[in-house]
Swiss-Prot record:
Entry's Gene Ontology molecular function annotations: DNA-binding transcription factor activity, RNA polymerase II-specific; molecular condensate scaffold activity; nuclear receptor activity; nuclear steroid receptor activity; retinoic acid-responsive element binding; sequence-specific double-stranded DNA binding; zinc ion binding
Region (Hinge): 205-230
Gene Ontology annotations of biological process type: cell differentiation; nervous system development; positive regulation of transcription by RNA polymerase II; retinoic acid receptor signaling pathway
Subunit relationships: Homodimer. Heterodimer with a RAR molecule. Binds DNA preferentially as a RAR/RXR heterodimer. Interacts with RARA.
Post-translational modification (record): Acetylated by EP300.
Protein name according to UniProt: Retinoic acid receptor RXR-gamma
Length: 463
């Protein structure tokens, strides 16, 4: 095709100067336009006999260099130009090129592809003529296309997998012929013995497969250790101990019934909350690593989450109560009392979104403790000196809770997710309760005790 280079060749008009294209404590969150320049279109050589000169029509198809999917190409490209005739009287002689001879010699290689729009014309990206530049893309075992260097030898995926299986399973093969079978792309599966021997002869290393297996095992063990270290560092037993240590004894409630509450239900709730705030500090100190934080960060976390922590506690305590809640003081607050006091809406949400859900899934004390620890370790609390440390502690509680649910309730694979789904409801209800408390504090009709008043003096939760 490229035989006679002494022929005169015609080029498209403007070949010498092809134009280029130019491109033109509160819950608060923690927290290249490149130009693609198309490559100049290169004219393609074509044979033109001396006796019958022809004019070559150029199809202007600029080629854009491939880049990242995030690159923005801003150059405005016009439509392809039409056929351009060469100016009369201008004939150019195509100089002989040793590179063109290389193209002739490897014209069957897959490296040579036709230029888009001009079928039959080889592209100008000539392969290197250095020894081995083409061989390295061929599988040394069967001659198929190589996918890279595997176990010391350039090989295809098929021969790589065959050698790895042979070594890992310690397979032994036999040859039915004379141990000199031809191994190529079409017949590589006919004799496993000769294929394996050729792998060894070409330089594949058994120890490379064994080292790869060892690295995979070590990586798996390391990942397993990382997964278990989270709940070993935050043992669920200690979280359960913290819950049991501060929970009022059920026998202290006596035989109190719904009628024991003689005062306004809101007053009873505020009084119980004030008492529970003292025990809340003791509970937090028993949670692993909480006391390791700075004193300032401990105060910030308690101020940011005290309302949600108390609501979670009395909601879980009330799962056995019919249509009401059980306070830490032993008093019951019935739904009807809450409605008469003007807090029926938020009371109904507590019963529906928290108490009822906890009862349906039979949430145990360990799960309750983990959920409360997740609320406690809030990395978004405003003013923390080291939010990343708090976030790490929260992630450890996540890992502990997930491991616990998988081990204790293997028949409920979605239990961990169900538990976490209670947190948004707890957050929303906690904010609404704060609004009520601030209202009662503002109007002054409800007596609010000292500790609770101190918490309300810094309204961190209102966002």
């Amino acid at each position: 095709m490229y035989g006679n280079y002494s022929h005169f060749m015609k080029f498209p008009a403007g070949y010498g100067g092809s134009p280029g294209h130019t491109g033109s404590t509160s819950m608060s969150p923690s927290a290249a336009l490149s130009t693609g320049k198309p490559m100049d279109s290169h004219p393609s050589y074509t044979d033109t006999p001396v006796s019958a000169p022809r004019t070559l029509s150029a199809v202007g198809t600029p080629l854009n260099a491939l880049g990242s999917p995030y690159r923005v190409i801003t150059s405005a490209m016009g439509p392809p130009s039409g056929a351009l005739a060469a100016p009369p009287g201008i004939n150019l002689v195509a100089p002989p090129s040793s590179q063109l001879n290389v193209v002739n010699s490897v014209s069957s290689s897959e490296d040579i592809k036709p230029l888009p729009g001009l079928p039959g014309i080889g592209n100008m990206n000539y392969p290197s003529t250095s020894p081995g530049s083409l061989v390295k893309h061929i599988c040394a075992i069967c001659g198929d296309r190589s996918s890279g260097k595997h176990y010391g030898v350039y090989s295809c995926e098929g021969c790589k997998g065959f050698f790895k299986r042979t070594i890992r399973k310690d397979l032994i093969y036999t040859c039915r012929d004379n141990k000199d079978c031809l191994i190529d792309k079409r017949q590589r599966n006919r004799c496993q013995y000769c294929r394996y021997q050729k792998c060894l002869v070409m330089g594949m290393k058994r120890e490379a497969v064994q080292e790869e297996r060892q690295r995979s095992r070590e990586r798996a063990e390391s990942e397993a250790e990382c997964a278990t270290s989270g709940h070993e560092d935050m043992p669920v037993e200690r979280i359960l101990e913290a819950e049991l240590a501060v929970e009022p004894k059920t026998e202290s409630y006596g035989d109190m019934n719904m009628e024991n509450s003689t005062n306004d239900p809101v007053t009873n709730i505020c009084h119980a909350a004030d008492k529970q705030l003292f025990t809340l500090v003791e509970w937090a100190k028993r949670i692993p690593h909480f006391s390791d934080l700075t004193l300032e960060d401990q105060v910030i976390l308690l101020r940011a989450g005290w309302n949600e922590l108390l609501i979670a506690s009395f909601s879980h305590r009330s799962v056995s109560v019919q249509d009401g809640i059980l306070l830490a003081t032993g008093l019951h607050v019935h739904r009807s009392s809450a409605h008469s006091a003007g807090v029926g809406s938020i009371f109904d949400r507590v019963l529906t979104e928290l108490v009822s859900k906890m009862k349906d899934m039979q949430m145990d004390k360990s799960e309750l403790g983990c959920l409360r620890a997740i609320v406690l370790f809030n990395p978004d609390a405003k003013g923390l000196s080291n939010p990343s440390e708090v976030e790490t502690l929260r992630e450890k509680v996540y890992a502990t809770l997930e491991a616990y649910t998988k081990q204790k309730y293997p028949e409920q694979p979605g239990r961990f997710a169900k538990l976490l789904l209670r947190l948004p409801a707890l957050r929303s209800i906690g904010l609404k309760c704060l609004e009520h408390l601030f209202f009662f504090k503002l109007i002054g009709d409800t007596p609010i005790d000292t500790f609770l008043m101190e918490m309300l003096e810094t309204p961190l939760q209102i966002t």
